[in-house]
């Protein structure tokens, strides 16, 4: 009877299944995935203004960035700016319409408008993503903005 041989085969199979379940996804993500660390994003300045002669508020948020992953340099990427009220309610999400080409270092400005009924204080979060806006490529930047005050 070949019991020891069958048991050994089951043991090898079990080890293979465990490795496949736990380690392959980790290796795959570290090799192929976006980690949110490819780009170092820094705050430059922001404005939350009433536009003269118009019935809207405008939000401008400027960032500088440095790409640490050579595979990301030259690729089309995107970024998202989310605007929240003080209590955390999402007011608006905006992005760069066709994305932009990532240079080794550079800057990117996000601009959007809000109705004049918007609160006078908002919280803004900016993050760079892949072109499809599904995977983060950078750290996020969070700033509280006050109407008619440049930061």
Residue ranges and their predicted role:
Residues 52-64:
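Contiguous beta-strand segments within globular domains
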Residues 16-25:
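Bacterial N-terminal signal peptides
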Residues 89-103, 141-146:
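Solvent-exposed serine/threonine-rich low-complexity stretches and specific carbohydrate-binding patches
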Residues 134-151:
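Short beta-strand elements
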Residues 67-76:
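A short beta-turn/strand-edge loop motif at beta-sheet boundaries
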Residues 94-132:
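Short, solvent-exposed, Trp/other aromatic-anchored flexible loops in extracytoplasmic proteins
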Residues 31-55, 148-151:
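Short, compositionally biased P/S/T/A/G/V-rich stretches that sit at domain boundaries
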Residues 4-16:
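Bacterial N-terminal signal peptides that target proteins for export
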């Amino acid at each position: 009877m070949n019991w020891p041989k069958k048991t050994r085969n089951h043991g090898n199979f079990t080890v293979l299944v465990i490795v496949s379940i736990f380690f392959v996804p980790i290796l795959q993500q570290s090799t192929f995935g976006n980690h949110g660390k490819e780009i170092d994003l820094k705050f430059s300045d922001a404005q939350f203004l009433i536009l003269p002669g118009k019935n809207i508020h405008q939000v401008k948020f400027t960032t500088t960035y440095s790409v640490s992953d050579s595979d990301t340099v030259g690729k089309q990427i995107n970024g998202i700016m989310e605007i929240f009220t003080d209590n955390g309610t999402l007011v608006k999400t905006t992005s760069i319409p066709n994305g932009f080409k990532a240079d080794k270092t550079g800057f990117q400005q996000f601009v959007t408008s809000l109705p004049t009924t918007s609160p006078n204080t908002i919280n803004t979060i900016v993050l760079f993503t892949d072109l499809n806006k599904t995977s983060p490529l950078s750290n996020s930047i969070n700033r509280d903005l006050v109407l008619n005050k440049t930061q």
